[in-house]
Swiss-Prot record:
N5-methylglutamine carried by residues: Q232
Transmembrane segments: none
Gene3D superfamilies listed in its UniProt record: 3.30.160.20, 3.30.70.1660, 6.10.140.1950
Protein name: Peptide chain release factor 1
Lineage of the species this protein comes from: Bacteria, Bacillati, Bacillota, Clostridia, Thermoanaerobacterales
Protein function: Peptide chain release factor 1 directs the termination of translation in response to the peptide chain termination codons UAG and UAA.
Source organism of the structure: Caldanaerobacter subterraneus subsp. tengcongensis (strain DSM 15242 / JCM 11007 / NBRC 100824 / MB4) (Thermoanaerobacter tengcongensis)
Compartment(s) where it occurs, according to its Swiss-Prot or TrEMBL record: Cytoplasm
An example Gene Ontology molecular-function term: translation release factor activity, codon specific
Protein's gene: prfA
Matches recorded under InterPro entries: PCRF (IPR005139), Pep_chain_release_fac_I (IPR000352), Pep_chain_release_fac_I_sf (IPR045853), Prokaryotic/Mito_RF (IPR050057), RF-1 (IPR004373)
Keywords recorded for this protein, A-Z: Cytoplasm, Methylation, Protein biosynthesis
Length: 356
């Protein structure tokens, strides 16, 4: 471990020299590459330097233990205990920094929420989840844009697809994929019985054109007239677009925009994200077979969280976390849950790093 850290620090010093070298600066592409690498390892190097400083302090303090002065010796023992604790803490932090980074963490996301079992109540819950993520995004300073929505007459969503753009969006929202369950008394329920409904959330990293190349011969594009609630026409032109990816059978429909071009662009953006997710899942299949992650990003069929209204309770089943802050969570206060999921995920990866 120490040898690896020293090698990283040596590389950091080398990169520091390169990015201030006029010959390198004149080649913008090369300079950017070095700056990116330099930034990627900076946190590890700074933490390692802090660790080395503590080692020096431990060595100096240990020398005081041989002192004849009992008071000085006692002070040294107390300080040594604190330094050893600090050393262990720094090493744990370094290990976390050394964990492989998810290359998609800095990407924007495309989220899909679909009403599951529970009819109208499930559609209302899908809306509640959409509102929760929208409010969370606002708190983070991220931008939300609805790409496609299938609304119900009483204000729910049968399905809603939306993008969230902002720094680190995927790194925090990726843990939301899976089946979310709600337990509450519907407003339409006269008998006051608690109903259980579900909604499925999918979180896809937004794919750039360089990530996924779509062969024009592999897609079929149909245009038709947009329709609103009850099938009434909302547009007199064929502006709605249905894109079918022939090799996979994936179908994406967009009709929210008045322009056929805008709907086509949105449909292709969603398709690109879905194809990228398929490729990622294929890559991760072998890893998943070797190590079943307790948290991961959650299989879509996996029930991950329950929102219990009578008890004001939210329970994340993957880590056994229960919070009696239902309204706060639904108002976008998600950090406490997400931070706990990230810590658990890191602990699992550290355990595997040790085993390997």
């Amino acid at each position: 471990m120490i040898e690896k850290l020293q090698a990283i620090e040596d590389r950091y010093v080398e990169l520091s020299q390169k990015i201030s070298d006029p010959n390198v600066i004149s080649n913008v592409e090369e300079w950017r590459k070095y700056v990116k690498e330099h930034a990627a390892i900076e946190d590890i190097v700074l933490k390692y330097r802090e660790y080395k400083k503590v080692l020096e302090e431990i060595k100096a303090t240990e020398e005081l233990l041989s002192s004849q002065d009992e008071e000085l010796k006692e002070m040294a023992e107390e300080e040594l205990s604190q330094l050893e604790e600090k050393k262990e803490k720094l090493m744990e932090e370094i290990k976390i920094l050394l964990l492989p980074k998810d290359p998609n963490d800095e990407k924007n996301v495309i989220m899909e929420i679909r009403a599951g079992a529970g009819g109208e109540e499930a559609a209302l819950f899908a809306y509640d989840l959409f509102r929760m993520y929208t409010m969370y995004a606002e708190k983070k300073g991220w931008k939300v844009e609805i790409m496609s929505a299938n609304k119900t007459d009483i204000g729910g969503f049968k399905e809603v697809i939306f993008s969230i753009s902002g720094k680190g969006a995927y790194s925090r929202l990726k843990y939301e994929s899976g089946v979310h369950r709600v337990q509450r008394i519907p407003t339409t329920e006269a008998g006051g019985r608690i109903h259980t409904s579900t909604a499925t959330v999918a979180v896809l990293p937004e794919a750039e054109e360089v990530d996924v190349e779509i062969n024009p011969n592999d897609i079929k594009i149909d245009v038709f007239r947009s329709s609103g609630h009850g099938g009434q026409s909302v547009n007199t032109t064929d502006s709605a677009v249905r894109v079918t990816h022939i090799p996979t059978g994936i179908v994406v429909t967009c009709q929210d925009e008045r322009s056929q071009i805008q709907n086509r662009e949105r449909a292709l953006k969603i398709l690109r994200a879905k194809l990228y997710e398929m490729a990622l899942k294929e890559q991760q299949r072998e890893i998943a077979e070797a190590r079943k992650s307790q948290v991961g990003t959650g299989e879509r069929s996996e029930r991950i969280r329950t929102y219990n209204f009578p008890q004001g309770r939210v329970t994340d089943h993957r880590i056994g976390l229960t919070l009696y802050k239902l309204q706060e969570v639904l108002d976008g206060e998600l950090d406490e849950i997400i931070d706990a999921l990230i810590l658990n995920d890191q602990a699992e990866k550290l355990k595997n790093m040790t085993l390997n």
